[in-house]
Structure formats: structure tokens, C-alpha cells
Amino acid sequence: MSKPETPAAANFLRPIVQADLESGKHAKIVTRFPPEPNGYLHIGHAKSICLNFGLAQEFGGECNLRFDDTNPAKEDQEYIDAIKSDVRWLGFQWAGEERYASSYFDQLYDWAIHLIEAGKAYVCDLSPDEAREYRGSLTEPGRNSPYRERSVEENLDLFARMRAGEFPDGARALRAKIDMAAPNMNLRDPILYRIRHAHHHQTGDKWCIYPSYDFTHGQSDAIEGITHSICTLEFEDHRPLYEWFLDNLPVPCRPRQYEFARLNLNYTITSKRKLKQLVDEGHVGGWDDPRMSTLSGYRRRGYTPASIRAFCDMIGVNRAGGVVDIGMLEFAIREDLDANAARAMCVLKPLKVVITNYPQGRVESLELPRHPKQDMGVRVLPFSREIYIDAGDFEETPPAGYKRLIPGGEVRLRGSYVIRADEAIKDEAGNIVELRCSYDENTLGKNPEGRKVKGVIHWVPLEGSIKCEVRLYDRLFKVANPEKSEEGGSFLDNINSGSLVVLTGCRAEPSLANARPEERFQFEREGYFCADLKDSRPGAPVFNRTVTLRDSWGQ
């Protein structure tokens, strides 16, 4: 696609931060990125990372990495390690050590007691189903819990016994006492603590009660001195509760919450629950499968940190929602790799060519530039009597407009000579297994005399080329909105069965023999590829297609 028409890095938060600093409201900006460690980061998180770390960098502030680890049943150290790796890979470093909401559990417990003593929190014995019924709906007010008027002394006693482990999971909960008739349902006596007898990856078995996200979020911001607490729009209705807690607790500072529109990318799913389902049910090879929308998946596919940062800059930051075309992300990586990826040749479907009039035993060393514009040096290809071309570059009965090799026709070999197809050798089934060609020895680096050769094809030497595996990745979903499915179906019905094609027996030029994991190339005429982070080995490389040379989706 051509360069997308987008505002120049629109960001409604930038003037807010600038004004706060200029007015002296804040001496320094402090932001935070607070993921829950219950899955791998995805492309939507990249927008939040670039926003929070980017604002801090731009205005000379700091950004904390804080793990919102209040739900031990779904969290794991694997996710913590992956998140830290992904943030660093994107090019950012958090202030000091990483932080954990669980580090504040003692303080949060004390603040819960503060609310109980102030008559603003109570222990409720309603079951989850009963509490849901009492809560009401958007059109009907809720009803007060029958346990709402317990005395301060009884609530303190029950809360202490909750912590001591006397009650089973779900038997009781600590709730804030706000307003069961509030139009904003988040203010209808929200839960502060639940009983969960679960081992925690940071605190072990110290706690059997865990604070809710809403109770943890703002107070963690206050403890860390966050000035601008930036989250996505679905938390806009939670802001009154965020502020209620700050109003009613002796917090050391008062952060402010701002909301922006989350990233919605077509042909993509970013629900961590559904991404986990794809992994658990074997639809993909793992969280870092190159078809996944996870940052580790994009990394393994060959996306660069710079391309993802550029994409996030292109789409900007605003409060209006909408769906972003995945073509913008693909545009960003094409721009990056076109400028920075070394060129190489790889034949995906090798067809042997014998150049019958080329001298037996002769080998020429041909120098080809590693990049057409940047000074990256040259790579050397041996040229001799036998080479490989791609089977798709020869047609006995070509369609209209075909400019590659045909019987009696000529093409130029990239960086080499003009050859003519003289004879096609077939096996018993009629498949072409070899071409006999002749070359024009006067066409190295110049056009043939008296005729024009339009087609140029890539090639590799038969001797010296390396065998490799090439994985052709495409979009995991075949429809723009994979969440939408037929009645009774699921998003899994929209999986693109052609999202991965594995080609073995490909032949690559010698310079690719020792490609480093994650090293990126443009395979001339084929697309942009990278050596696989996990499976590629010296002498046995595996290349993943990052993106095609141009947007050909649906064509």
C-alpha cells in the first residue's frame, strides 16, 4: 500500500503533560506500564508501552514497569519474564527495578482497615450470584446488602478472620460502602477483597485474600508517585471509583487518570483469553508463533522494534475508537526493511538449469551489492554451468504479459548473464525437472546487442548454494473481523488454513549459510525474511517470511 494518510503523530496527552510541567503542577512526569502477568504482550500493548515510555522520555521523566499481580490463579513467572523481555526489545527501560502490586499488599490491607474504621467498607456474605442480583442493572438501581450495616467492630473481626484463612473461597468479600443506586454501576459497593486460597508467585502463601484491580490500581499509582495514570477507554467508567478511593484514603500523592482509545487492528485478535486458547488447543505453535499478534510473535516473524514504534506513532493517540488497517503495520515494516535489510537470493522451488554452452569446469565469482542504496558491501556468488532458478519462472504456455523464461525466450539472471531456454527435460509423469539453456557471454553487466530483454529473474548456483527451510507466513485470520462468526460458531472458524506454508529443499545463496537468528533480508523478488529465532542453525538455516514485497492480500 502507499503511505497511509495519517495525522503527524497526533497525541492529545502531549499538551496536557506539557502544561502540567510548565505550570509547576508537577516537577517531573512519572508514568507507568502496568500489565497483568497472565499472558504475553500483544500489539495493543505496544501502543500503551510506546505512549507511557515515550511521554516519559520526551519530557525527561520516568516510567515504571509494574506488574498488576492480584490474581495468582492466572499468573505465572513465565509471563513476567516474557513481558520484561518484550519491553526491552521494543527499546525501553523502566525506572529502577520492576515493581509489583503485590509489594503493596500490606499497605493496601492497612488502607482497607482504614475504610472499615471510617464506616466506608463492610464484609458481605452474599454469594457471587446473590451479589450480582442485588447489584441491579443499568436501568434498575441495586439493593443494599443485608450485611451492609454491620458494625465497625464486627467488620474488623470478620476481615481479620478472612485474612487468617478461616473461610473458604467465595464465602465472604470486603466491599466499599458507596451507593447502590449510583447510575455508574462501578460505584455500587464494589468488591475490595476476595478470599482466594492460592499460592502467589511473589508472596507465596502469605495471603489468602487478594485485593481487586480497582482497589489496587489507583493506590499503587499513589504509592509510586505516578503523575499521569494512562489507561484505555474501557476504564473511563472506573475513574469515579479511582477518585473515590483517593478521596477517602490517606494516600501520599494524588495521581490523575486519563483514557485513550485502545488499538483495534483488523484481521487480528488481541484478547489474551483467546490467544491462550489458540496456544492451548494447538492452533498455533506457541505464544511466539509468528502468526500471533503477540510482540514475541512479531519479533520471531522478523518485525523490528523500530517498525512497531513507527506504526504506533503513525496511528497516534486519541480518544476516538475505530479499526486500524493491518496494512499500516505491514507498511511500517516494509519501509524499515526496504531501507535496512541486506539483499540476497533464495530459490523457493528449485529447478535445475544446465547452461550448455558455458565452459565445463569454469567458475566465475560475481559480485552483487548487499543493498542498492546503502553501502553494505558486496556478496560473492559463484557462477558456473549449473544453477537453480525458481520453477515458477519458466512457462511452456505462458499467460498474457508473462515476462520470464519461455521456450526460445530470454531473461537476464540477476547480476549475471542473459540466458535463453532451449529445451525442457521432463520425467515420466510429464513434470519439468531440468532446463537446458544457453547464455550470451557478452551480456555480463550490459544489454545484448540488437534486442531487448525485459525479464529479470533470480538464481543461485547449484554448487555452493545451501539447502534451507522457508516458512511462508500469512495472516492468521481470513476475515477482517475474526471476532464475528456465524451463529453457533466461534472465532476459530475464521482461521486462515493457508496462514503457514512450509517449504523444504529451498536453495539459498552461499552468503546466507551463517545467517544469525533474527537477521533480516530481502529475498529478491520474494519478500522480506528473517532467520528464525529458535530453529535456524549455521549451515541449516530456517527463514520466516516477515511480509511480502508489496500488499497483495486478496489479489
Swiss-Prot record:
Subcellular localization: Cytoplasm
Domain of life: Bacteria
GO MF term list: ATP binding; glutamine-tRNA ligase activity
CDD domains: GlnRS_core
Nucleus is among the record's keywords: no
Matches recorded under PROSITE patterns: AA_TRNA_LIGASE_I
UniProt xrefs under Gene3D superfamilies: HUPs, Ribosomal Protein L25, Chain P
Catalysed reactions, semicolon-separated: tRNA(Gln) + L-glutamine + ATP = L-glutaminyl-tRNA(Gln) + AMP + diphosphate
Keywords: Aminoacyl-tRNA synthetase, ATP-binding, Cytoplasm, Ligase, Nucleotide-binding, Protein biosynthesis
EC number annotated for this UniProt entry: 6.1.1.18
Keyword DNA repair: no
HAMAP family reported for this sequence: Gln_tRNA_synth
Designated name of the protein: Glutamine--tRNA ligase
Originating species: Azotobacter vinelandii (strain DJ / ATCC BAA-1303)
Lineage of producing organism: Bacteria, Pseudomonadati, Pseudomonadota, Gammaproteobacteria, Pseudomonadales
